[in-house]
Every structure is written in C-alpha cells, then in structure tokens.
C-alpha cells in the first residue's frame, strides 16, 4: 500500500507540472471535440496528431494522446443524446434512451448523468489500473519468447472475435497487417524483404503514414461520400441539475457499469463497445420497469456511459504492462512510445517510473477537467454540431500531411499516406474493418521476433509452444475465442451488438 502511495505521489508530481497540465487540458478538450463531431473520432485524430508529438517530451505527448482518447468517450455521448448520432461507436447505446430524454425536454439531465457517470467510472477504473498494473508487469517480466509469442497470438485472435462484422474479413485484415509489417530488413539477417528496390522502404513502412492514411484520410473519404445534414433538435440545454429521484435511479447502474467496463475494457478489439451494450442489457433485465427502456429511461444512459468510460481507462492495462494494444487507439499510442524511443511493456514501470505513473495520475486530472469543461461548454458543442464536415476536412488533411512530413522530412511518407488512404477507403467500401489491419501491422514485428527467438532457443522444435504450459494455455484460449465467435448463435449476437455506426 505504501508503495502505491509513493508511486502515485511521483505520478502526481510529474502530471501536475504546468506543461503537462496544459497538454492534458488540450488533450481532453480535443478529445471532447472529436467525440462531439461525428465522423472524426479519436483514432483518426491521434493518428494525425502523432507526428507533432515527436517534438514533445515522452510523458507530455502520452498524457495528451491519452486525454484525447478518454475525452472522446465523454464527447461521444453529447451527439448521441442531442441528435441521436453517436460520436463514438461505444456511445451508440446511449442514444437509445438519451435522445428520448432530450425529446422530452430532459437533455440537461441526460448530459449531466453521462458526465457524472463517466467521471465516477473513470476515477474508479484508473484506481484499478494503478493497483493491477505493477503485479501484472512483474509477472510479464518472467515471460520468455514462447509466452510472449502466445500472448500476442491471443491478442490478435481475441481482436478478431470481437471485431465488427465478418470474422473471416477481420482475419484477412490481420494477415494484411502482418504482411505489411514484414516490409523492410530482416531483423536477424538484414536481408531486404518486399522493398522492390525502394530505399525508403528499407527501414519498413512508416507507421504514422499507415495510421494517418488508413484511419484519417480513409475516414475523410467515407464521410465526404456519406455526409448528411445534422439536425440539432435541441438548440439550448437548460437545467443540468438532477433530482433526488434521478440520483437514486442512476446510483446502481453507474456502479454496475463501472464494474462491467473495468473488466471488459482489457479485452482486445471492441471491449469498450461490448461493455456499453452489456451494461444496457443488464440494466434492462434488472429494472422493475423494463418497458421504460427505449423511451427515455435514465438508467439507459447512466449504465452504458459508465461502462464505456471505465473500459477506456482499463484498456491501458495490457498496453502498459505487456506492451500489447487492446484496440487501434492503443496501437497508435504504442506508435507514440516507439517514436519517443521507448519500448512499451513491463520494463517501462521500472525504467521510466515517472512516465508510467505520470500517465496514470494524469487520468484523474483529465477526468476532473472533463467534468469542469463539459457541462459549461454544452452550448458550444451544440453550435459545433452545425458546422458542415466539408468545411473541416481540408484543414485536417493539410495538417496531417505537414505533421507526417516533419518527422523524417521525406516526401515519400506523404505519398504513403495517400496510398494508405485509398487502400483504407477501398477496404471500408468492401465491408472490411481497418482496425485489425493496424493491430496486425503493430504486433507483426513483435510476433516474428518472439517466434524466431523461441525457435532458436528450442533449436527449431515447434513443440516448445505446446510443452510450455503458459504458452499452450494462451494459444488454446485464443483458438477457443475464434471458434466460439464462429458459432451461429454467437454470430447472430455479434451482428446485433457490433454494428458500425455511420
């Protein structure tokens, strides 16, 4: 307990420096903004801001990027409640009852419920992250190459089973990502692979170019093609105060949503989306008045919003302790670590304690800033919703291109953004989700490194993955997840839950 207090004091000492507070504020403000504006989202935003973070200190850049992510979870509920259009996929279920509350003149209470539930869940989940991370990191330090290989395979397989849409398409995207990750020099022999004589590809495909293209540019193409007018039914939000009856009704859902989200948030893929839907289903089943759900039940806002914000915090657990991203945003944050010359994983807690605990402490600060920011600025967010998307995208594209070019001062990186953007758009049009591609691209080199290291140690004996109990167990769990996801009854439920919100 004393170690935890000592570590948290180091974290707050780091996070409370003026520069880190300012960038934490900027991060959560940007996160809320991109969460409010449908069609942008934290993945595309972080991908585009990644290049400029290279000029920051590691802790400052990661505090800001983390703030964008969990800030977007807050912002996503605003559009879900006001215009029935979720800014984030995890806020889709919030729209069911939140929008009905707004239509009944209770938009203020719905927004206050979302903000307070999110604040409570974020604080509790961050505490769980602080408690769980050190022992998990200690265990991970004892892992050898076979265990790490199996762990990465498990992460990829679970992300496939939780991905939106077809399991086979998700598997295909993982394979494409793994193949893109092999471009460049062989890690052991130095032999060039798939470079086709291009010197720029010798060091591999630029991660930032792939991320900005597949998530940023492709998303812009999609939104320009599918752009529709946003009708803001609520012009002015009044009365944010909750009654005693409202507090009584939201207390249970907020606590249960926090617990569900904290557990499901560590799952690779769509853990935060699953958490919000699971919370909604649980509250509807537990309610004495289930007929109110879908018609403005305040519990239908409190539970899911608490769940998805708790999941946003605990999704950092596998990243900070194992170096394995739980979903695309975490994969981008892995990229931020790498840009700063830091390998994410269990070593970070010992080699960079100020960074590790500074990120955790900043989450409490960020959650407090979000509550202070969001409720007074609701009027501003309502006005932002009226801005046509076609007026936003030119500035976004130019900013992303300049940022990517600034990393290596190489025009090839900008060309790569264009190619990746076209590829990402075509994949989206074919019904393929690009998120598994990015996970495969990030984890591919790690997968290859640990596979080859394990084979060298075992002198070419592949049975090392079967005879090693931890590795065998992890591989079995991953295989079971995919098999279960392919079962007809489970597939129908996946199709119902993991719907891509356009």
UniProtKB/Swiss-Prot annotation:
Pfam family, one: TctA
Alphabetically ordered keywords of this record: Plasmid
The organism's place on the tree of life at top rank: Bacteria
PANTHER family: TRICARBOXYLIC TRANSPORT PROTEIN (PTHR35342:SF5)
Protein known as: Uncharacterized 52.8 kDa protein in TAR-I ttuC' 3'region
Source species: Agrobacterium vitis
Native organism taxonomy: Bacteria, Pseudomonadati, Pseudomonadota, Alphaproteobacteria, Hyphomicrobiales
């Amino acid at each position: 307990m004393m170690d935890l207090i000592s570590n948290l004091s180091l974290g707050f000492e780091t996070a409370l420096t003026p520069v880190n507070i300012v960038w934490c504020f900027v991060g959560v403000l940007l996160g809320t903004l991109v969460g409010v504006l449908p069609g942008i989202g934290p993945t595309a935003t972080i991908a585009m801001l990644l290049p400029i973070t290279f000029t920051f200190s590691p802790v400052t850049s990661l505090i800001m990027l983390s703030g964008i992510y969990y800030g977007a979870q807050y912002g996503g509920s605003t559009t879900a409640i006001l215009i029935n259009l979720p800014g984030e996929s995890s806020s889709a279920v919030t729209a069911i009852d939140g929008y009905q509350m707004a239509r009944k003149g209770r938009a203020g209470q719905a927004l206050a419920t979302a903000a307070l539930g999110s604040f409570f869940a974020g604080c509790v989940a961050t505490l769980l992250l602080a408690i769980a991370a050190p022992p998990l990191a200690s265990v991970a330090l004892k892992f050898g190459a076979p265990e790490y290989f199996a762990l990465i395979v498990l992460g990829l397989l679970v992300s496939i089973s939780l991905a939106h849409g077809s399991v086979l398409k998700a598997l295909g995207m993982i394979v494409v990502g793994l193949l893109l990750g092999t471009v460049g020099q062989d890690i052991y022999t130095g032999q060039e692979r798939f470079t086709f004589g291009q010197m720029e590809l010798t060091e591999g495909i630029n991660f930032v170019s792939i991320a900005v293209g597949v998530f940023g540019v492709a998303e812009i193409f999609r939104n320009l093609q599918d752009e529709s007018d946003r009708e803001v039914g609520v012009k002015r939000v009044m009365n944010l105060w909750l009654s005693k009856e409202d507090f009584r009704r939201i207390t249970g859902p907020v606590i249960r949503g926090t617990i569900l989200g904290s557990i499901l948030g560590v799952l690779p893929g769509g853990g935060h989306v699953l958490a919000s839907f699971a919370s909604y289903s649980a509250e509807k089943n537990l309610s004495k008045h289930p007929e109110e759900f879908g018609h403005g039940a305040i519990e239908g806002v409190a539970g899911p919003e608490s769940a998805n914000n708790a999941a946003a915090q605990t999704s950092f657990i596998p990243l900070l302790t194992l170096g394995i991203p739980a979903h695309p945003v975490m994969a981008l944050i892995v990229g931020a670590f790498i840009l700063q010359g830091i390998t994410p994983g269990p070593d970070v807690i010992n080699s960079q304690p100020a960074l590790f605990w500074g990120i955790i402490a900043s989450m409490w600060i960020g959650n407090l800033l979000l509550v202070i920011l969001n409720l007074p600025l609701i009027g501003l967010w309502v006005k932002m919703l009226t801005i046509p998307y076609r007026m936003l995208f030119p500035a976004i594209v130019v900013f992303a291109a300049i940022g990517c070019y600034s990393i290596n001062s190489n025009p090839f990186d900008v060309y790569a953004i264009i190619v990746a953007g076209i590829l990402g758009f075509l994949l989206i049009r074919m019904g393929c989700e690009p998120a598994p591609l990015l996970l495969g691209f990030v984890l591919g080199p790690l997968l290859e490194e640990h596979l080859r290291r394990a084979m060298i140690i075992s002198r070419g004996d592949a049975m090392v993955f079967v005879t090693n109990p931890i590795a065998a167990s992890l591989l079995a769990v991953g295989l079971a997840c995919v098999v279960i996801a392919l079962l007809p009854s489970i597939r129908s439920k996946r199709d119902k839950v993991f719907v891509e919100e356009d």
